[in-house]
Design a protein with these regions (language model features):
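Vicinal oxygen chelate
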Residues: 1, 10, 40-43, 80, ...
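Conserved beta-strand in the GNAT
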Residues: 54-55, 123
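Short amphipathic alpha-helices within nucleic acid-binding modules
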Residues: 21, 86-91
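Core segments of cupin and vicinal oxygen chelate
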Residues: 2, 10-53
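Short, charged/polar surface micro-motifs in flexible loops or helix N-caps
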Residues: 47-52, 60-63, 84-86
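Eukaryotic phosphotyrosine signaling hubs
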Residues: 5-6, 73-77
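A short, acidic/glycine-rich surface segment
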Residues: 39-41, 62-67
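Short secondary-structure boundary/capping segments
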Residues: 33, 45-46, 67-70, 89, ...
């Protein structure tokens, strides 16, 4: 029986620029950074976070480079949950995160949409409990 999702791969152009965005701007932590023969096994997650992690996977050919920033076909790729929307929203703004929509209220919670360094759309969301 499948019991969870542990990692989701994100194709990136460069490991270091992806770490800079996700860790320095968004406040994620590197969970593992293992050098393999031809790549790195590089996992990140929100500091103090739980659940799924993002595996940063450097593109190695033209086919993979073509999907950078387009892995969700223009839809939202990630949904990042917060327990303090206003504080996190203001902090991300102060760090130069590019919000493109919101904040706005939906029936399920408060949402703002931003783009990562490659143009992937990401929701910051605080759910109604």
């Amino acid at each position: 029986m499948i019991v969870g999702i542990t990692q989701i791969a994100l194709v990136v152009r460069d490991y270091e620029e992806a770490i800079a965005f996700y860790c320095e701007k968004l406040g994620f932590s590197v969970v593992e950074d293992t050098q393999l023969e031809t790549k790195r096994w590089l996992r990140i997650r929100p500091q103090g976070g739980r659940g799924s992690e993002i595996l940063l996977s450097r593109a190695i050919d033209d086919e993979q480079r073509a999907v950078i920033g387009k892995q969700a076909g223009g839809r939202v790729l990630f949904f990042f949950e917060t327990d303090d929307f206003e504080t996190d929203y203001q902090q991300l703004l102060s760090r130069g995160v590019d919000f493109i929509e919101g904040p706005f209220n939906q029936s399920y919670g408060k949402v703002a949409v931003f783009k990562d360094l490659y143009g992937n759309r990401i929701d910051l969301i605080q759910r109604i409990r």
